[in-house]
Amino acid sequence: MASRGALRRCLSPGLPRLLHLSRGLA
């Protein structure tokens, strides 16, 4: 499941951004 770790690593920095976007949209 190396791809899973890579995805998590790529999403890690993007998660906060997504949260901010969702908060602004909500």
UniProtKB/Swiss-Prot annotation:
Name of the protein: PRKCH upstream open reading frame 2
Pfam family, one: PRKCH_uORF2
Record's function text: Product of an upstream open reading frame (ORF) of PRKCH which regulates translation of the downstream protein kinase C eta (PKC-eta) ORF. Functions as a repressive element that maintains low basal levels of PKC-eta in growing cells but enhances its expression during stress conditions induced by amino acid starvation in a EIF2AK4/GCN2-dependent manner. In addition to its role in regulating PKC-eta translation, also inhibits the kinase activity of PKC-eta as well as other protein kinases including PRKCD, PRKCQ and PRKCE but not PRKCA, PRKCG or PRKCZ.
Subunit and partners: Interacts with protein kinase C eta as well as other protein kinases including PRKCD, PRKCQ and PRKCE but not with PRKCG or PRKCZ; the interactions lead to inhibition of kinase activity.
One BP term from GO: negative regulation of protein serine/threonine kinase activity
Comment field (misc): Suppresses proliferation and migration of cancer cells.
Record has RNA-binding as a keyword: no
Keyword Plastid: no
Keywords: Protein kinase inhibitor, Stress response, Translation regulation
GO molecular function: protein serine/threonine kinase binding; protein serine/threonine kinase inhibitor activity; translation regulator activity
Encoding gene per record: PRKCH
Organism: Homo sapiens (Human)
